Structure formats: C-alpha cells, structure tokens
C-alpha cells in the first residue's frame, strides 16, 4: 500500500476530511456568517455561534484581474467574490485563463483545492480557490 501524504489546510476554515469544504461560524441570533473567529457578531452583537458548512458551488459576483502583486506572487490571477448560496467567499479563481474573455459575472464555479507547498517531511499545505463548474 502506498503512503498517503499528510495534508494540512492553509486556513482553519478549509475542511479536508471527506469532501473538501469551507466551514463558517454562524451567529445563532441573526445568521450572519464569518470565516474568522468572533467574540461577538458584527451585525447584532450577540455572542452565540455554531459551525456550518458552506455550499461548495456558487456564482462569481465580483472579480478583478490582478496584474501587479507582491514579489514572488505569480501574475496575472483572478481575485473574486463568490456567492455560495448566500454566503460571500473571497478567493482566487483557479484553472481558468485570467482574462475578461474567460471570466464573467454570474459565472458558475465550484470549490477546488490545490497543493501550495510541501515540507521536508512530505506534508502538503492545501489551499483553495474556485474553478469553472
């Protein structure tokens, strides 16, 4: 049997067990969702939260083609806001040509993961983006 590389998510809200998905903190009072940990909801100031899985598909609501970035970051790439059935997710679009001819508002996309890097022990750091559906 082949060894399976250990995998760790690049961000805490990316869940890799089973089918990859994003998990948010949802306010138990008003339903606002946050990917980071909160002490109180920014919408209603309540303090109760539950963890919820986010839909793995959605539509591009806004995007920009980034042509200038920090040293070492390959350009161009597409930064987008994806509406995942009511939850906004900021992420890069991957596996698509970064040009206006290939990206459009309302474009259907789905969550995808990729290896960001591998350490000396073979552990893979896994990132996420959205690709055309």
Language-model segments: which ranges?
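A broadly conserved sequence feature marking short terminus-proximal activation segments
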Residues: 1-22, 127-129, 133
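Residues immediately within or flanking Cys/His clusters that coordinate Zn2+
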Residues: 21-24, 38
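Short, cysteine/histidine-rich loop/knuckle motifs that typically chelate Zn2+
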Residues: 26-29, 40-46
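Short functional micro-motifs and their immediate structural scaffolds
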Residues: 35, 48-50
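Conserved hydrophobic positions within beta-strands
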Residues: 58-60, 93
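Beta-strand/loop nucleic-acid-binding surfaces
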Residues: 88-99
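Short nucleic-acid-contacting surface segments enriched for D/E, G, S/T with interspersed K/R
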Residues: 97-110
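OB-fold/S1-family single-stranded nucleic acid-binding modules
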Residues: 114-133
């Amino acid at each position: 049997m082949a060894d399976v590389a250990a995998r760790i998510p690049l961000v805490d809200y990316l869940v890799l067990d089973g089918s990859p998905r994003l998990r948010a903190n949802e306010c138990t009072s008003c339903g606002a969702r946050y990917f980071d940990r909160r002490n109180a909801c920014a919408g209603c100031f309540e303090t109760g939260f539950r963890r919820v899985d986010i839909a793995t598909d959605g539509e591009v609501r806004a995007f920009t083609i980034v042509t200038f970035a920090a040293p070492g970051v390959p350009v161009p790439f597409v930064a987008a806001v994806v509406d995942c059935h009511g939850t906004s997710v900021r992420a890069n679009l991957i596996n698509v040509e970064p040009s206006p001819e290939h990206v459009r508002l309302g474009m259907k996309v789905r969550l995808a993961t990729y290896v960001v890097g591998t350490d000396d022990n073979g552990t893979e750091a896994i990132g996420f983006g959205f690709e055309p559906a």
